[in-house]
């Protein structure tokens, strides 16, 4: 069984906890209770393979950035969530993505962009096209979800697992190439008996 450390990041109030609870327990939590930190574990099957997902739901508030940064350092894949009904949450994504790369000290990480609350289309402030364009700029997958209506909830987590798998395979491939190129070429020695 493969283990994955997945982290939800995004501004406060966008529905990170609701997505997580809907995925873990198949229920929708209506009231907003700001998260400091929560962790969950779920065993599931993705593309025919058994997976154990450790899911870390982080605080959106800047007051808890040290806790969030710790999860960023240890996480393998990131579900970055904004609300389609709140333009400011969308505007914060690029900064959050850059901060994540800085904390991880990497050029790229497995990352899925999620526009949540698509059931509230009449209050939409961020178009689907804007989400798709940002995902293209960030070179990541994009889905619109609704924790309330259970739209694309599981698929967003599964897509992130797929991205982590790709990154692991890419790292294994590059590590094996580095080992091959870093090894000095050994000359064959012959033994002469006199």
Swiss-Prot record:
Keywords: Cell membrane, GTP-binding, Hydrolase, Lipoprotein, Membrane, Methylation, Nucleotide-binding, Prenylation. Residues 192-194 form a propeptide. Gene3D superfamilies: P-loop containing nucleotide triphosphate hydrolases. Its main location: membrane. InterPro entries: P-loop_NTPase, Small_GTP-bd, Small_GTPase, Small_GTPase_Ras-type. It is found in: Cell membrane. It catalyses: GTP + H2O = GDP + phosphate + H(+). CDD domains: Ras (cd00876). It is a lipid-anchor. It holds the Pfam family Ras. GO terms for biological process: actin filament organization; cell morphogenesis; cell motility; cortical actin cytoskeleton organization; macropinocytosis; negative regulation of cell migration; negative regulation of cell motility; pinocytosis. The modification Cysteine methyl ester is found at residue 191. A lipid is attached at residue 191 (S-geranylgeranyl cysteine). Transmembrane segments: none annotated. Residues 169-180 have a biased composition (Low complexity). Residues 168-194 are annotated as: Disordered. A motif (Effector region) lies at residues 32-40. Ras proteins bind GDP/GTP and possess intrinsic GTPase activity. This is Ras-like protein rasS. It comes from Dictyostelium discoideum (Social amoeba). The lineage of its organism: Eukaryota, Amoebozoa, Evosea, Eumycetozoa, Dictyostelia.
């Amino acid at each position: 069984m493969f283990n994955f450390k997945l982290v939800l990041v995004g501004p406060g109030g966008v529905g990170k906890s609701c997505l997580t609870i809907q995925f873990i327990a198949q229920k929708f939590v209506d009231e907003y209770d700001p998260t400091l930190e929560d962790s969950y574990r779920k065993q599931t099957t993705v593309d025919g393979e058994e997976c154990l997902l450790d899911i870390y739901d982080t605080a959106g508030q800047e007051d808890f950035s040290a806790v969030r940064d710790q999860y960023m350092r240890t996480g393998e894949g990131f579900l970055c969530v904004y609300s389609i009904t709140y333009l400011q949450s969308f505007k914060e994504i690029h900064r959050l993505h850059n901060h994540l790369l800085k904390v991880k000290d990497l050029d790229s990480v497995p990352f899925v962009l999620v526009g949540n609350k698509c059931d509230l289309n009449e209050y939409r402030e961020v178009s689907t096209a804007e989400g798709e364009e940002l995902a293209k700029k960030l070179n990541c997958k994009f889905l619109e979800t609704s924790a309330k209506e259970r739209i694309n909830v599981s698929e967003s987590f599964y897509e992130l697992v797929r991205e982590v798998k790709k990154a692991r395979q890419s790292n294994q491939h590059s590590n094996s190439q580095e080992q091959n190129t870093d090894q000095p070429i050994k000359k064959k020695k012959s033994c002469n008996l006199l």
